[in-house]
Amino acid sequence: MTEQENAIAVSHLAKSFGATQAVRDASFEVRFGDIFGLLGPNGAGKTTIIRMILDIFKPDRGSISVLGGAMTEQKKDLIGYLPEERGLYKDISVERCVLYLAELKGVPHNEAKTRAAQYFDQLDLTAHKRKKVQDLSKGMQQKVQIITTLIHRPKLLIIDEPFSGLDPVNTRLIQDVLLQERDRGTAIIMSTHQMYQVEEMCNRIVLIDKGESVLYGTVDDIRRQYADNAVRVVAQGELPQIEGVRETSRKGNAHVLHLTEQVSTQALLRQLSEAPELHIESFALALPTMDDIFVRVVGETRPTAKGTD
């Protein structure tokens, strides 16, 4: 893929602060239309990488291409950044705060009002737009922060823990907004510790540990790569005893069968299909969760000295 087709191209980044090496060797690419997961434990170097992408820090080694080349002042207006440390003007109304920050990003006043009204409606904030930001709940402030990050229609969106403080209803509202941005062609980098959100939303990820890229690819490919020889069977009736099944677990009508190397999934399906009074509703590979993979990959490298996030 060419540089122009990538929103971000990071190659062999390294960054130290005194004797502490925060980033050792990080490489990845983010495409337009991606929701890309930037993952890693606390202290892995994720925030330092984000700050290098945004040109807040300069790398000691390696290269970064942002929207087709080096970062410029003009490109900064094409980027939306939601940091983990939130920042809003708290002593003014929600509407005034959103419009002010939109105009700082070059959005004309009338256009900013139109976009703000659309977001207020979409995120159930219309009834609260005259309130001071400081009078809103944490979850509502989070939604306002999301609006200020999106209102200038960025080509690149970098969001750090976007679902922090949100209940399930508001989490779904924010998910819908982010998917809408993805469908518009926006490149989205999402840093989060919520692995179920990664499975639901991200198509590609990089896992950073101790400042290095240790896992990189599509979510589907990575889950298949770490899959055990196991299947998930949903069936009505009792499963028969089958030679070569070394471990089983059950939740309701769903059974996970871990097989020995000598048993293939095709052979297992044949045996189950021949079992009397067993109605199979689904039969599929049992893929590990991203949470399982995160713990496995990061756990393989512990213990060690901590890095700096």
Locations of the language-model features?
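Residues at or immediately preceding the N-termini of alpha-helices
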Residues: 72, 109, 219, 262-265
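Active-site phosphate/pyrophosphate- and oxyanion-stabilizing loops and adjacent acidic/basic residues
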Residues: 99, 196, 220, 270, ...
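Structural motif detector for alpha-helix initiation sites
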Residues: 32, 94, 219, 287-290
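ABC-family P-loop ATPase nucleotide-binding domain
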Residues: 1-14, 300-309
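ABC transporter nucleotide-binding domain
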Residues: 175-260
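ABC transporter nucleotide-binding domains
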Residues: 5-8, 15-209, 215
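Short, charged/small-residue-rich alpha-helical element at the C-terminal edge
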Residues: 228-300
